[in-house]
């Protein structure tokens, strides 16, 4: 007899519902705690996550659950070809526009999905690598609200960062 998998319903801020396996849902510590506290019977509302972003989060969690299952608890998984495939998948996953990437960071933080938070924050850090403060401001559309004097003072106090 086939084992039936427990399903969980997640409800996005814009009213979309997603029915997913509990094993995928518990990649989120936030959702895991709600399930443990018996708060999942009528679906779990996620008021801080839109349907589009939740779909991406679910895609990430599902891929990582499947990869772990395929590895079968193999301790050498993290040095294996399968892990290289997952790393490649992850690097493609974060090749999204900037607003989506930032929304994924917020969702990963809200849902407490450490791997996704690390991945998305690393993607932003990689975008910053090698850029001057001016280039970063332009890239992230950040207004410089320092006076020239204040900026010179900050640069002087933090010379090590500009070497």
Swiss-Prot record:
Gene3D superfamilies: Potassium Channel Kv1.1, Chain A. Part of a SCF (SKP1-cullin-F-box) protein ligase complex. Interacts with At1g56610, At1g67340, At3g62230, At3g59000, At4g27050, At1g55000, SKIP16 and SKIP32. InterPro entries: SKP1 (IPR016897), SKP1-like (IPR001232), SKP1-like_dim_sf (IPR036296), SKP1/BTB/POZ_sf (IPR011333), Skp1_comp_dimer (IPR016072), Skp1_comp_POZ (IPR016073). Mostly expressed in inflorescence and siliques, and, to a lower extent, in seedlings, roots, and stems. The keyword DNA-binding does not apply. Transmembrane segments: none annotated. Belongs to the SKP1 family. One of its GO terms (biological process) is response to jasmonic acid. Pathway: Protein modification; protein ubiquitination. Involved in ubiquitination and subsequent proteasomal degradation of target proteins. Together with CUL1, RBX1 and a F-box protein, it forms a SCF E3 ubiquitin ligase complex. The functional specificity of this complex depends on the type of F-box protein. In the SCF complex, it serves as an adapter that links the F-box protein to CUL1. Residues 105-163 are annotated as: Interaction with the F-box domain of F-box proteins. This is SKP1-like protein 4. The keyword Calcium does not apply. SMART domains: Skp1. Pfam families: Skp1 (PF01466), Skp1_POZ (PF03931). Keywords: Nucleus, Ubl conjugation pathway. It is found in: Nucleus. GO terms for cellular component: cytoplasm; nucleolus; nucleus; SCF ubiquitin ligase complex.
